[in-house]
């Protein structure tokens, strides 16, 4: 007697943020109790169960597939891996196709001949509906098994029931098929409760109490017939629960005598399970894969293409059946079972099998990452310094290492690792000598081959790199740790080629071309084969989680991400990263490219498991996402390659920009502006001198008029004239002194404006908690500036609550 369980999950992005909580707090407990695993992790030998999964989406063009299902498995660990690897994407605009998902579960539970006696011989059947959206309100064409009635005249009514139905109508069929229906929802939606009530065996029975104190907003409804699930949430456990319920004992005892005949009849009737030929890969032992029949229309891509488990090839894999392709039809499996994808080495894993059809672009993604890292030379901890006033970042973020680094077509043998790169050919030139391009006959001298075979480095296409000319700027020693080079002077030297830097906007740089036959890597004339011992350069997976944004203040799942760091970077780089990265704000990429940062930044490569419209909007609008980590700040931008993102990781909760030294052109422009203002000052001085002469002439004219009009008062006027003449120079001196002060005021203002302009250039905004504030550089950087110009220097920021339009 085999008990069966089907988990029907909504695959849209609405359920993504809550999925880990649902699996850890509810599904994990139910499945372990269903498999008979007690608290000591000892599996009961009497447990004979099978589990499967159905994933449904929404109607409309926003979902690639309406309904997908997996095969049956008897391995608990494999099924838990399936659940943890569900790709939640799309949807969110329409109601979920709950009716189609429940109907698919009924098809998987149904008996081919519909015999009631045989149905009684089968074990218990349970279904758990997990959805975060309301069901589609209109009846849709779904398939439901036709239950044979005792009277023949009722067959017509049974045939008419399987045409159009909504979710509640499909749920009413579950009690007729002796299937228990349970519901888990992260929101208390009344329509999902109505579906649960429609699927109850006894509508008047009270719902068993479930402790939801940890998640008060969750709707958890467990069927009264799902004894294992109720025992998983009860503190007393399965033993006390079985002793307190006598109907359970009677049910088990009545079924036990027919267990022998049931196994025979079940094996004879279960013709839907088709054994597949063994699949062998490397050192993995073969295992039988069971595939469900083709009951729905074949589709272009396989369902759950990334669900198979990844384990080291040196360890035995007891159940590859768990990693069987969760497909929609046999036809799809026959086309996709031989497709392999090579992934970067992840903590000792050498090779992973992944049935891929529509996701073939992922092969190019990681190969492109290997090529990008081939030019990086294994060092991602780069001290970003100024090279003669030219920013080193240039178009690193805007191009995203995509336009300059094409996908590789390197041939990898089955015994080699997934990524083979070289670091010995990275140029390191002296300060007094320019490097030259040379074409070595082979890479055996600078990059030894792996496993006795030559390493195919690059194939077709040009990989433009950059060669920094020496300008007396110190070289960061962290860049050389991956190459094993020590004792190099830090005061001089050239920087390593950085992928993604444009050739037009970088003066003093030389492109490094790579053709299809030989790689022209710049090598120093003083470099020998034994001077720089090469090390295998690879990217290591350090993090996997979700990327979410905000829409109207609520978190919205965007995509599933995988983060990769360089082998030379710190192992504890992502030690305290949360499982979900929350985007707090958006900034412009153009502003980032024109700035330089204080301290060092770690470059990381992220791979998006599925494409989302928000990522394409970031690329079109040239925006960069800011993510606040517990002790770091991550700037994330989308590259030109599909599903690839570039991350810049900075320590601390803010990013500090380097002060910009004004170039010679800017100084010349300032001098020209000052010279243009000098003629204006000269004109003002001339006008002031004319005004002084007028003031001097006015008192003399008044005295002459008075002498002509009053001849009788000449004696008195003669006595007063010396006094007035003595007063005129005093008035002239006062007026001249005032005019000189007025002339000095613009000059002082100009002298004060020049230091203010220099201070404004040195004061740069920061990304992080102080996005709308300006901080002083140096020791007093944490003090707020009181100038009114500080608020106008902030980065152009899209409001955090509305960037997910």
From Swiss-Prot:
Function: Component of the Mediator complex, a coactivator involved in the regulated transcription of nearly all RNA polymerase II-dependent genes. Mediator functions as a bridge to convey information from gene-specific regulatory proteins to the basal RNA polymerase II transcription machinery. Mediator is recruited to promoters by direct interactions with regulatory proteins and serves as a scaffold for the assembly of a functional pre-initiation complex with RNA polymerase II and the general transcription factors.
Residues that span the membrane, as ranges: none
Signal sequence residues: none
GO BP: positive regulation of transcription by RNA polymerase II
Residue stretches of biased makeup (Low complexity): 438-451, 786-795
Annotated InterPro entries: Mediator_Med25_VWA (IPR021419)
The protein's name in its UniProt record: Mediator of RNA polymerase II transcription subunit 25
Organism: Solanum lycopersicum (Tomato)
Subunit relationships: Interacts with MYC2 (via N-terminus). MED25 competes with JAZ7 for binding to MYC2.
GO cellular component: mediator complex; transcription regulator complex
Disordered as annotated region, ranges: 430-455, 786-805
Family, similarity comment: Belongs to the Mediator complex subunit 25 family.
PANTHER family for the chain: MEDIATOR OF RNA POLYMERASE II TRANSCRIPTION SUBUNIT 25
């Amino acid at each position: 007697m085999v008990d069966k369980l089907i988990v029907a999950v909504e695959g849209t992005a609405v359920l993504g943020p809550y999925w880990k909580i649902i699996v850890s707090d509810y599904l994990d407990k139910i499945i372990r109790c269903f498999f008979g695993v007690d608290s000591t992790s000892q599996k009961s030998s009497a447990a004979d169960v099978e589990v499967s999964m159905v994933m449904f989406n929404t109607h409309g063009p926003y979902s690639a597939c309406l309904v997908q299902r997996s095969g049956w498995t008897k391995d608990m660990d494999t099924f838990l891996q399936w659940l943890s690897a569900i790709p939640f994407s799309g949807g969110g605009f329409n109601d979920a196709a709950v009716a189609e998902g429940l109907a698919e579960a009924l098809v998987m539970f149904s008996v081919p001949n519909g015999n009631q006696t045989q149905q009684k011989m089968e074990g218990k059947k349970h279904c758990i509906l997990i959805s975060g959206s309301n069901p589609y309100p209109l009846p849709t064409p779904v398939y439901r098994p036709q239950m044979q009635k005792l009277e023949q005249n009722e067959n017509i009514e049974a045939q008419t029931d399987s045409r159009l139905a909504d979710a509640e109508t499909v749920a009413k069929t579950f009690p007729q098929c002796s299937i228990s229906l349970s519901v888990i929802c992260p929101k208390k939606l009344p329509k999902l409760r109505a579906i649960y009530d429609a699927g109850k065996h006894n509508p008047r029975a009270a719902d068993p109490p479930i402790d939801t104190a940890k998640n008060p907003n969750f709707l958890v409804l467990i069927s009264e017939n799902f004894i294992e699930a109720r025992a998983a949430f009860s503190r007393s456990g399965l033993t006390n629960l079985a002793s307190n319920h006598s109907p359970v004992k009677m049910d088990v005892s009545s079924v036990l005598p027919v267990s022998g005949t049931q196994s025979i009849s079940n094996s004879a009737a279960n013709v839907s399970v088709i054994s597949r030929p063994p699949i062998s890969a490397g050192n993995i032992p073969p295992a039988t894969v069971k595939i469900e029949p083709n009951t729905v229309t074949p589709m272009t891509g396989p369902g759950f293409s990334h669900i198979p488990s990844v384990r080291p090839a040196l360890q035995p894999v007891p159940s590859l059946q768990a990693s069987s392709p969760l497909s929609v039809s046999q036809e799809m499996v026959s086309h996709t079972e031989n497709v392999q994808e090579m992934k970067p080495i992840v903590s000792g894993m050498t090779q992973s099998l992944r049935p891929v059809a529509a996701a073939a672009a992922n092969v190019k993604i990681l190969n492109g990452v290997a090529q990008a890292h081939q030019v990086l030379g294994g060092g991602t901890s780069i001290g970003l310094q100024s090279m003669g006033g030219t920013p080193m970042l240039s178009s690193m973020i805007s191009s995203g290492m995509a336009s300059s680094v094409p996908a590789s077509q390197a041939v990898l043998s089955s015994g080699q690792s997934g990524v083979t790169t070289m670091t010995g050919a990275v140029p390191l030139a002296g300060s007094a000598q320019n490097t030259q391009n040379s074409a070595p006959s082979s890479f055996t001298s600078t990059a030894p081959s792996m496993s006795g075979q030559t390493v195919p480095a690059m194939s077709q296409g040009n990989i433009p790199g950059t060669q920094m000319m020496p300008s007396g700027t110190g070289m960061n020693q962290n860049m050389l740790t991956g190459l094993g080079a020590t004792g190099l002077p830090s005061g001089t030297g050239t920087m390593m080629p950085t992928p993604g830097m444009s050739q037009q906007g970088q003066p003093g740089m030389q492109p490094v071309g790579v053709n299809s036959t030989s790689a022209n890597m710049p090598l120093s004339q003083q470099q020998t084969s034994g001077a720089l011992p090469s090390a295998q350069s690879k990217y290591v997976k350090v993090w996997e989680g979700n990327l979410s944004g905000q829409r109207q203040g609520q978190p919205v799942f965007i995509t599933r991400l995988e983060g990769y760091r360089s082998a030379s970077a710190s192992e504890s780089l992502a030690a305290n990263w949360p499982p979900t990265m929350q985007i707090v704000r958006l900034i412009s990429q153009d502003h980032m490219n024109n700035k330089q940062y204080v301290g060092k930044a770690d470059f990381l490569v992220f791979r998006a498991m599925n494409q989302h419209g928000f990522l394409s909007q970031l690329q079109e609008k040239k925006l960069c996402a800011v993510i606040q980590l517990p002790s770091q700040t991550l700037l994330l931008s989308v590259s030109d390659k599909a599903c690839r993102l570039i991350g810049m990781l900075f320590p601390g909760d803010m990013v500090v920009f380097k002060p910009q030294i004004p170039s010679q052109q800017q100084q010349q422009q300032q001098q020209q502006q000052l010279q243009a203002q000098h003629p204006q000052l000269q004109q003002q001085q001339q006008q002031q001198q004319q005004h002084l002469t007028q003031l001097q002439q006015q008192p003399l004219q008044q005295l002459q008029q008075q002498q002509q009009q009053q001849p009788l008062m000449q004696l008195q006027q003669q006595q007063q004239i010396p006094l007035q003449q003595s007063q005129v120079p005093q008035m002239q001196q006062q007026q001249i002194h005032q005019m000189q002060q007025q002339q000095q005021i613009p000059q002082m203002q100009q002298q004060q404006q020049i230091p203010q302009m220099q201070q404004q250039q040195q004061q740069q905004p920061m990304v992080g908690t102080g996005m709308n504030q300006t901080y002083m550089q140096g020791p007093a950087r944490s003090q707020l500036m009181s100038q009114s110009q500080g608020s106008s220097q902030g980065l152009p920021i899209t409001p955090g609550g509305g960037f997910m339009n």
